Amino acid sequence: MVSLATRKSLPKVKAMDFITSTAILPLLFSCLGVFGLFRLLQWVRGKAYLRNAVVVITGATSGLGKECAKVFYAAGAKLVLCGRNGGALEELIRELTASHATKVQTHKPYLVTFDLTDSGAIVAAAAEILQCFGYVDILVNNAGISYRGTIMDTTVDVDKRVMETNYFGPVALTKALLPSMIKRRQGHIVAISSIQGKISIPFRSAYAASKHATQAFFDCLRAEMEQYEIEVTVISPGYIHTNLSVNAVTADGSRYGVMDTTTAQGRSPVEVAQDVLAAVGKKKKDVILADLLPSLAVYLRTLAPGLFFSLMASRARKERKSKNS
């Protein structure tokens, strides 16, 4: 049986509930509105940041680099496309300029042909790049090579080749272009690394080592360039459906020539390129563009290293068994 005091308090409780609900809902919608406005301003600022920016992209003739060229071009950037194959670069420029789907003013790209493993060529290429527009706003270090093999079977020459392409080449090009950015107190360095720059998986030692080195170098660079107002972004994709595994080198330096299942099931390079564009436009510092499990593995490596190492050892046993069967 409800007491008289309880009956008297019920209207007060209902009134308080009504006041609380009517106060919280507008506050909630206001917060959502502010968040939406913030995201809209981020999007607009990112678009403005990329429009007419001089963007250099290495490894632009295929895979992620080619798709990055397309999205940066469509965003109105002034492109300098780099690669080893001049014919493929010219074909890409014809493909870009033939498109009429862009909503902003576009600019005919320049091309610079050179090999990232040739230190002498990099110095000359940097000078040629600067001659195109007189300066560089954004450098996208995308070119790279993958690797498959056991550590014991892999020659040191192969280790060096992977490091030259994935680490020393981008470092040399970055150092060659940095003085012009420092002089202007303006610039943005982007390193397309890999999830394997944060975790290491078996039979990828040379590749993982080169990407770990990339992560470390550009993290250091970010801190050192802060005083010059130069941005540094490290992007770590997971598996992307490109020919990266097909063109990978093996333990003896020969071409792997196989599309791995994980690569075949990877994300579309078109989607990843859009994410790269967004990350650069928002000036993000460090971005992981991988599926849930690889992303969780990054945290597992730190929070439960013993479990992570056991899982990698198990993976190595399974891969070894499948190759021997």
From Swiss-Prot:
NAD(+) binds at S62, L64, Y207, K211, T242. Gene3D superfamilies: NAD(P)-binding Rossmann-like Domain (3.40.50.720). Keywords: Endoplasmic reticulum, Membrane, NAD, NADP, Oxidoreductase, Signal-anchor, Transmembrane, Transmembrane helix. One of its GO terms (molecular function) is oxidoreductase activity. InterPro entries: NAD(P)-bd_dom_sf, Sc_DH/Rdtase_CS, SDR_fam. Residues 1-17 are cytoplasmic. It is found in: Endoplasmic reticulum membrane. One of its GO terms (cellular component) is endoplasmic reticulum membrane. The active site is at Y207 (proton acceptor). This is Dehydrogenase/reductase SDR family member 7B. The gene is DHRS7B.
